[in-house]
């Protein structure tokens, strides 16, 4: 059963104009980060491509520790505030959440993937419906119910 079957929804063949305009909406930041991984780092569609080292060089006044074992708030805020055009949703066919994903390494450069910091434990149907071509997702979660 695909993700659409899980949510009791049929896959739409084409996006209508109302869906392709605007920006994607997220209730869960960790889902947004997973989508950013796909669009920015895997498919190279979402620009600018965020790099914590370049960001730290441009914002020396923030004194960003690029060897951090904790969340770099300015980096997290960049992703939190990033608008993702709805037109890119059609390109998301799979999500592969992994502790080594670039999006996470740009938020916590020395993250070992062993805690629940980026776990995707909650997901709403309104969030997932934005991705009509999403067929497969490998997620990080601590919710095994």
How should each PLM-predicted stretch be described?
Residues 1-10:
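Short acidic, low-complexity intrinsically disordered linear motifs used
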Residues 8, 16-17:
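A composition-biased, non-transmembrane "mature-region" signal
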Residues 17-144:
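LRR N-terminal entry segment and analogous cap-like coil->beta motifs
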């Amino acid at each position: 059963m695909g993700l659409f079957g899980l949510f009791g929804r049929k896959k739409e063949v084409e996006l209508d104009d109302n869906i392709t305009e605007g920006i994607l909406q997220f209730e869960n930041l960790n889902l947004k980060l997973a989508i950013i991984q796909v669009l920015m780092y895997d498919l190279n569609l979402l620009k600018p491509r965020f790099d914590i080292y370049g960001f730290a060089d441009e914002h020396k006044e923030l004194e960003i520790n690029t060897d951090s074992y904790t969340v770099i708030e300015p980096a997290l805020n960049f992703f939190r505030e990033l608008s993702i055009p709805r037109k890119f949703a059609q390109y998301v066919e799979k999500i592969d959440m992994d502790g080594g994903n670039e999006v996470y390494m740009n938020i916590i450069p020395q993250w070992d993937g062993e805690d629940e910091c980026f776990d995707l434990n909650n997901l709403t149907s309104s969030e997932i419906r934005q991705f009509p071509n999403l067929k497969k997702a490998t997620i990080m979660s601590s919710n095994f119910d």
